[in-house]
Amino acid sequence: MDRKFEVSRKTGETDITLSINIDGSGKSNISTGVGFFDHMLNLFAKHGLFDLDVKAKGDLEIDAHHTVEDVGIVLGQAIKQALGEKKSIRRYGSSFVPMDEALVLVALDLSGRPYLVFDAELKCEKLGNMETELVEEFFRAVAFNAGITLHVKALYGSNTHHIIEAMFKAFGRALDDATRKDDRIEGVMSTKGML
């Protein structure tokens, strides 16, 4: 069964169509109007080996908040739907990713229990037309809409771009790990019998 899904969401603030193929090869086609965010989503797809298409139009004349958060909502919904009943997936994933002087850890659990721990000092307030505080909002939106327990921690680093880039790469790698199928797992990876 294909593990892919497409979601469309239209509000008074944004109009988004997103599709993801969990078993892809890292191809992406991203257009949100927020250049730095597009770059980060491309990195997430490439390093997670997901095929990801995102078309978003938002109220960027105000700021990037609605666009970034709503893409996170839709990405979370697409991940959840693409995984279906989560049969035979490894469930847990983690990744340490260095980017020059920065080192980031992402650990996650596809538990169905949404939670975010985000621990990072982002010294630069804006990269391109994106406020760096929106990175946490994005991860929160993904986690809560996909049902992921997600921990994102910058262990150290001084360059905000490097820290955030390492976060998106590590998130892709950790999610790839957690979504991999393992033939040894019968049903789901839980003694409860469901996730």
Swiss-Prot record:
In terms of CDD domains, this protein maps to: IGPD (cd07914)
Report the principal subcellular site: cytoplasm
- Give the GO biological process terms: L-histidine biosynthetic process
Give the molecular function GO annotations: imidazoleglycerol-phosphate dehydratase activity
Q: Where in the cell is it found?
A: Cytoplasm
Q: Which residues form the signal peptide?
A: none
UniProt cross-references to InterPro entries, sorted A to Z: IGPD_sf (IPR038494), ImidazoleglycerolP_deHydtase (IPR000807), ImidazoleglycerP_deHydtase_CS (IPR020565), Ribosomal_Su5_D2-typ_SF (IPR020568)
Which family is annotated?
Belongs to the imidazoleglycerol-phosphate dehydratase family.
Q: What is this protein called?
A: Imidazoleglycerol-phosphate dehydratase
Annotated organism of origin:
Acetivibrio thermocellus (strain ATCC 27405 / DSM 1237 / JCM 9322 / NBRC 103400 / NCIMB 10682 / NRRL B-4536 / VPI 7372) (Clostridium thermocellum)
Its organism's taxonomic lineage begins at: Bacteria, Bacillati, Bacillota, Clostridia, Eubacteriales
